[in-house]
Each structure stands twice: as C-alpha cells, then as structure tokens.
C-alpha cells in the first residue's frame, strides 16, 4: 500500500448526491475524466455511482469511467456507492477482472 504524505485527491462521481467533505464532486463521466487528467496531486480514491441520470449524456453511466480507467491502465482504488444492484454487479465484475 502506498502512503502519501501531503495532499491527495478523492473523486466522487454522482449526479445527485453531494460529495462528502474532502472529495471533488464530478457529476458526469467526462467531468471525472478531465479531473483525473488534470489532477496535480495523487488520486487516493474514486467513489462511483452507476446511474448518472441527466448527466449520462456526458460520457455515459459510471461503468464507462471504469472502462476508460482500464483502457488507460489507471488502476486507482475504487469504491462503489450505487444503489443499482445490476449496475453494482457489473462494475464489481469489471473491478475484479482488471484491478
């Protein structure tokens, strides 16, 4: 496990639920991608929802961020907070396969 001394980024991908304190709130997959690409500090965690509602037009649902991370070999720690059981299982299957 890598321990960072200093500032780290935690990303919260969700269209409705506000980010907890200390997280950067991204409402769409494309916003999350831009946030990751421009991060100036190490990314400690990405906490994902699956269903992004009105923001799905901007990059798809949360699983699309996992697709992009795997394609770009960016294997940050992932946590899921989605309430969609099918979406959660699909995301977990992807995490088990690539992470």
Question: Residue locations for each model-derived region?
Answer:
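Catalytic phosphate/metal-binding cores of nucleic-acid and nucleotide-processing enzymes, i.e., regions
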Residues: 1-99
């Amino acid at each position: 496990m890598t321990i960072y001394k200093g500032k780290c980024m935690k990303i919260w991908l969700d269209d409705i639920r506000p980010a907890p304190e200390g997280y950067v709130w991204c409402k769409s997959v494309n916003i999350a991608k831009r946030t990751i690409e421009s991060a100036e500090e190490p990314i400690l965690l990405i906490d994902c929802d699956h269903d992004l509602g009105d923001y799905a037009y901007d990059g798809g649902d949360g699983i699309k961020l996992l697709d992009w991370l795997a394609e770009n070999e960016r294997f940050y720690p992932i946590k899921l907070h989605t309430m969609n059981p099918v979406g959660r299982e699909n995301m977990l299957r992807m995490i088990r396969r690539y992470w």
